[in-house]
Amino acid sequence: MPYRISRQAYAETYGPTTGDRVRLADTDLILEVEKDYTVYGDEVKFGGGKVIRDGMGQSQTPRTEGAVDTVITNALILDWWGIVKADVGLKDGRIVGIGKAGNPDTQQGVTIVVGPGTEAIAGEGHILTAGGIDTHIHFICPQQIETALASGVTTLMGGGTGPATGTNATTCTPGAFHIGRMLQAAEGLPVNLGFFGKGNASTPEALEEQVRAGACGLKLHEDWGTTPATIDACLSVADRMDVQVCIHTDTLNEAGFVEDTIAAIKGRTIHTFHTEGAGGGHAPDIIKICGEANVLPSSTNPTRPYTRNTLEEHLDMLMVCHHLDPKIPEDVAFAESRIRRETIAAEDILHDLGAFSIIASDSQAMGRVGEVITRTFQTAHKMKVQRGALPEDSARNDNHRLTRYIAKVTINPALAHGISSEVGSIETGKLADLVLWKPGFFGIRPELVVKGGSIVWAQMGDANASIPTPGPVHGRPMFGAFGKALAPSCLTFVSEAAMDNDIQSKLRLDRTCMAVKETRSVGKSALKLNAALPKVSVDPQTYEVFADGELLTCEPAEVLPLAQRYLLL
């Protein structure tokens, strides 16, 4: 006779199942489990008196015959493709199974074999996401890496050489020497990394040199002169060498207006940074570029979401980052031209519509490297409060909104930069870069971060305590972040030309170098759940933003979730 268990007792034991709903931290966002891949009555769970024991949920299968290295049990997966409950199997640092784990000799429906060589991570009662991807990094200091990892970000792409004046302002690693040094520095950092060369040149030779030296992309920045000539030259090199181009356009409209930039791009793929404009770009209407099919538009987190403090903090940040002098009126006017409440408010709504596709940090250069995921779900919360449910959602859940927003910090930046075959989602064959969250801390403080199949970061108590949980409990680096375990768990993204140039051997790199691929064929239509193409216009006098003729405006938030409630010091 089957044993019956209440839904509440089941959720407390094995985590939520199909039809159960979970609130995310202190937001108003609710997810609902769409499907459960585990088998009722044959669930696996580790512990005294539990299932993963010899002859029960653990088989005799050796690793060589198919048993996985690690199983994450009963996890609630949140990814762009859906919200499901499943066991997840890891082997050789990659995801090899999403389904039902256990012993096929004693259990039904097993797709992930647990053996004597299998480690267990308890995922029941936790949310599992892919590691976050931040593609707007100013590599100003190496301490950013730990801060990003502590927030659930496992891949960082951008440019810089340290706290040089150029790096403080622009995400460029200029020239072969600096690219080589940064690739060597990456050896000791427990995340995936990729570096952008400086794209500001009107002839191709110096750009090609940087790509061969290991740049995985090129960055055009107005502080180095983003003119129509440099845009055309940079994109021409990128098309030949298959790397992405990122652009921060001409705020002052010195070399042309947004229409001139669009003309210079000539329909070629380009990733536009802080597309709203407060981070830089044609004033006041760079935001309209998000309606172009070849443009991959992103935001940076200082304007995510629009709050009562957003405008006030921006001016001083901008003056510092771009080496401006508050005593020079022209510098102040330059800064003030970028900060517009109307376009920042519209940015919130364009994200909710799926017209802006990516969110990144702009680390230490107006943005905060440890707040990408937090700011993303604060924006989702604010939009639910102000705009209500999306048409695709129901009164029961916010599943479509949640999958749309998680895509902005996982799969979409991966697609934009040609690394989606390796990272960006929870799919078999991809690198096991995974983040486990307690629902009450979702988006603000990961419980566990797995990098290439090894735990690299976790909430951990006093190391001198008798058990792992006594306080002070805080995030700390784990064994996967140390020694020779680090290199095989991480990837360094470079160009195919750099691989042909044998850059890994020339620089004596231990980490696996991986070439970015198909960066020139990706268009906005390829970006998951964020491919809307509204016709956007900006009133030049009032700065009001319209999409398909409709005014986009919203009030600033007075208070946000995922904030001081979690960060009292």
UniProtKB/Swiss-Prot annotation:
GO terms for molecular function: nickel cation binding; urease activity. The gene is ureC. This is Urease subunit alpha. The active site is at H322 (proton donor). One of its GO terms (biological process) is urea catabolic process. Its EC number is 3.5.1.5. NCBIfam families: PRK13206.1 (NF009685), PRK13207.1 (NF009686), urease_alph (TIGR01792). It comes from the Bacteria. Carboxylation allows a single lysine to coordinate two nickel ions. Ni(2+) 2 binds at K219, H248, H274. The keyword Iron-sulfur does not apply. It is found in: Cytoplasm. Transmembrane segments: none annotated. GO terms for cellular component: cytoplasm. The modification N6-carboxylysine is found at K219. The lineage of its organism: Bacteria, Bacillati, Cyanobacteriota, Cyanophyceae, Synechococcales.
